[in-house]
């Protein structure tokens, strides 16, 4: 089941929310767990057994690690056992086909008989729920969270359906208190519903429209330079609006149930370095890789060379996490290389001013990386890169011109205009906040009457108007209700676009989120 489907919008979600708010507080986690299992089993019932098995295994390992004591040798042995089993499960389902195909290719080239292996189907969401389980037992070992004895709460954490399929990658230590003490208010529900609608619009209106353009360009056998760059830019925008749209929907659903998940995107395409990009893109994964892989490898301990090596290996393995394809490994190596170079050069990763040249170079590096990330194989990537950097015919091919519609062109323009507007706004807002902190450190700051300011805790990834965050309350000084009209107007616009998106969804074929494949 996916969020952008009629069965979820008009059957599953209304029934679940009705039962959720009619039930007592003590039964809500159990209801959430049951609903999440139904949500997952809607795809395939048989893989639900694997999902439950991984959950129970890590719950038991967590108890063993916790009983052995923080960072003790016995706890380390239990942790190692848990992580090895988790990685073996993930490795088999995600990489068995790739491994056997690679071995068979080598054996065939030597004239040997290849292995016979039935194709292994990848369970949806396995990369996310295995990583979340691993982070839990590591946190118990480190003493960052106690081992929970409540199986229902732990199982609900792993299975909670808003983030189950494609993240954000959550951590038990951040949600443990919310499972027992979360608040449910009309304002919070309204904020969540608005955030959900934002994500739905991103997915259906923008990402799905751009997907047609990207798919067509990447499928061309002889793309022109114009075709290749159009495809690269279309996919760059498609991936952001698709994945950040899913994250918005997940965060919104969480708010509707009283949970507050971490933000997953902070205007990544405004970044002026690859290091800054990874502070803004898929934040839940990048921080997971930092805390559980980079630090485990040694982090910045051991000198400069070891630091560069650990950065590179972390991103290399991060690329492999995305899938069993050499293209993902190269993509990870590409980002790892630039992270190491920026670290070695000592580039300023938190610039105070917006440097167009630095931004353009960073964006170019990101787009180049997305091309191989999107390509089915090295042949497709080579074909696209060859066309992009031949700087030959910038005209679109006849096939492309024949298929490209005015709506698709307009959507691409709107997508990048939106990225530019909110990205620059986010940059200068953050700079003003930093300046404000410096001013408060030097002396008392004064406010002019009638100042409109955002409430602390604004969601950085959400749509903003000056002084407002869609889905959040705003403080107005003085509190004239007239000053709130932009927020209500924006909510009305989002509702209108949401209804239009539902109508568009009904008219198009099924389009899953891109990160479902990972």
Swiss-Prot record:
Active site: 322
Name by which UniProt lists this protein: Probable alginate O-acetylase AlgI
Biological pathway: Glycan biosynthesis; alginate biosynthesis
Naturally occurring in which organism (per UniProt): Pseudomonas syringae pv. tomato (strain ATCC BAA-871 / DC3000)
Entry GO terms, CC: plasma membrane
Membrane topology field: Multi-pass membrane protein
Subcellular location: Cell inner membrane
GO biological process: alginic acid biosynthetic process
Described function: Together with AlgJ and AlgF, forms an inner membrane complex which probably interacts with the alginate polymerization-transport complex and adds acetyl groups at the O-2 and O-3 positions of mannuronate residues. Acetylation of alginate is important for the architecture of biofilms and increases the ability of alginate to act as a defense barrier.
